[in-house]
Amino acid sequence: MGKEKVHISLVVIGHVDSGKSTTTGHLIYKCGGIDKRTIEKFEKEASEMGKGSFKYAWVLDKLKAERERCITIDIALWKFETAKSVFTIIDAPGHRDFIKNMITGTSQADAAVLVIDSTTGGFEAGISKDGQTREHALLAYTLGVKQMIVATNKFDDKTVKYSQARYEEIKKEVSGYLKKVGYNPEKVPFIPISGWNGDNMIEASENMGWYKGLTLIGALDNLEPPKRPSDKPLRLPLQDVYKIGGIGTVPVGRVETGVLKPGDVVTFAPNNLTTEVKSVEMHHEALTEAVPGDNVGFNVKNVSVKDIRRGYVASNAKNDPAKEAADFTAQVIILNHPGQIGNGYAPVLDCHTCHIACKFATIQTKIDRRSGKELEAEPKFIKSGDAAIVLMKPQKPMCVESFTDYPPLGVSCGDMRQTVAVGVIKSVNKKENTGKVTKAAQKKK
């Protein structure tokens, strides 16, 4: 076995008909976790339906259909491997909750593959003001996906004919846009591919001798392995708190950043309760330390179940402990709201595991969704489709962190049984409260 392979999560973005499914399907098909039997079954079904040539996208469509019907789908189907890395495709747009998923941290991507339709008319539609190419790229950058690969697809199309001039034209225009968003185009590989025929996907294409760069798989293998946030201070949002006979109080949650070890002194926010951790368990086994991504239960001393609850955040008392937020500034996109939203609007905010009403205290500026430029200072109202910077005030004590410090914590606002807005927290004003320190914690000081 030797060294373990690096795990990288990818999101595949791009305009509706850019060929994301075919391209993704092709990678999974060629390097992936789908067994031959499943592929043969899909191929047979595809040819029976007269979709023989559509087999790569068909693979993905089958997976999506199973996912939509909530059949818990074997996640191996969304994986593919190279010599160096294991890639998991965590979401592909077209899935209706894509934007929401990207934001609320159900999917923290390490890198994005932006698929572009290079055909005449197709490219222009995707990059136009209403196209999704720009929006997806901006969203990826805003949400902290700092590595990008651009796959200029459909180079086999009769309007493109593997043309170097078309490649240069697209590269120039998309680079300009990515630069505006915040990416450094020098570091973004542009790869002319055919997701359908496989040109430059895994092997260099014989149809494009003029292109001397990496194949798509080569570029994926060149991605920087993600730094897992175990070196950041501990943040562990609580999902539940149990009282277990003979053991005591056991909060449960997923470590988002940092590490948790038995013997640590933790502070819970927003109530500032400080105590010692007796033991940490995952799947009924004791751990010497829990790292980001681990779902753990931990036993705390001298704390009653009434003292802490879901939505609280555990942190290390000696290393930038979490605090209650007095208010915070968020950049939000209004997704669906029937009317106008003004100052004073108070939807329920979901961030990590907490679920608390937050007031739009001041809508500070309305911004352009695609460029991030200010359009209007202190607008009276914002409506569906608008992006804005808003000062928000929690209506009950809550703990949130800025997105740059603790990326897994994006926010979504709900009202009328739907997601009204999604966004990221830019900065937080924290309250300096004093809270109860248990005897166990005092002894450890």
From Swiss-Prot:
Q: Which residues carry this modification: N6-methyllysine?
A: K261
> Region labeled G3 — which residues?
91-94
Q: Where is this region: G4?
A: 153-156
Protein localization:
Cytoplasm
Question: Which terms in the Gene Ontology molecular function aspect does this entry carry?
Answer: GTP binding; GTPase activity; translation elongation factor activity
Q: Where is this region: G1?
A: 14-21
InterPro entries attached here? Answer: EFTu-like_2, G_TR_CS, GTP-eEF1A_C, P-loop_NTPase, T_Tr_GTP-bd_dom, TRAFAC_GTPase_members, Transl_B-barrel_sf, Transl_elong_EF1A/Init_IF2_C
Q: Binding residues for GTP, per the UniProt record? A: 14-21, 91-95, 153-156
Q: What are the record's GO terms for cellular component?
A: cytoplasm
The family annotation for this protein states: Belongs to the TRAFAC class translation factor GTPase superfamily. Classic translation factor GTPase family. EF-Tu/EF-1A subfamily.
- Protein name, per record: Elongation factor 1-alpha
- Native organism: Euglena gracilis
**What taxonomic ancestry is recorded?**
Eukaryota, Discoba, Euglenozoa, Euglenida, Spirocuta
**Gene field:** TEF
